[in-house]
């Protein structure tokens, strides 16, 4: 039998070659797994978004916010100085809106679940058109 010498260079090159093969396989496998998991997450999010119910949204909104806490100061419609500034050379710059117009824009707390946005928008557009005539 012949005695073979231990060739360090030979084993080193084989180990480097195997490391490249294993790392390449691992890289391609991990990128495929990441793409699959990203697609699954996007599909799950899309499904959850479709399941969101607007009544639940309004219920959560009503639970978290007390509508009585909101205060927006109303304009003073009876202020004479304000009315004088609007008349320039006998022409009215802006026409005042009555106070009830602004009150109707508020969504009342008891009607929060029964809001029909399209109907409210149509009413608002009709009121604006009536005032602008």
From Swiss-Prot:
Localization, UniProt: Membrane
A GO cellular-component term linked to this record: membrane
Membrane topology: Single-pass membrane protein
Entry keywords, A to Z: Membrane, Transmembrane, Transmembrane helix
Transmembrane parts of this sequence: 11-31
Origin superkingdom: Bacteria
Keyword set includes Membrane: yes
Protein name in UniProt: Uncharacterized protein BB_0044
Species: Borreliella burgdorferi (strain ATCC 35210 / DSM 4680 / CIP 102532 / B31) (Borrelia burgdorferi)
């Amino acid at each position: 039998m012949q005695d073979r010498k231990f060739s360090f260079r030979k084993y080193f090159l084989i180990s480097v070659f195997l490391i490249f093969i294993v790392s390449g396989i691992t890289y391609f496998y991990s990128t495929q797994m990441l793409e699959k998991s990203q697609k699954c997450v996007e599909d799950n999010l899309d499904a959850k978004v479709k399941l969101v119910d607007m009544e639940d949204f309004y219920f959560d909104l009503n639970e978290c916010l007390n509508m009585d806490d909101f205060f927006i100061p109303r304009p003073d419609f009876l202020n004479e100085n304000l009315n004088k500034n609007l008349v320039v050379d006998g022409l009215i710059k802006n026409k005042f809106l009555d106070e009830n117009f602004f009150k109707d824009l508020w969504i009342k707390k008891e009607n929060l679940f029964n809001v029909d946005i399209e109907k409210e928008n149509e009413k608002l557009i009709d009121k604006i058109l009536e005032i602008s005539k």
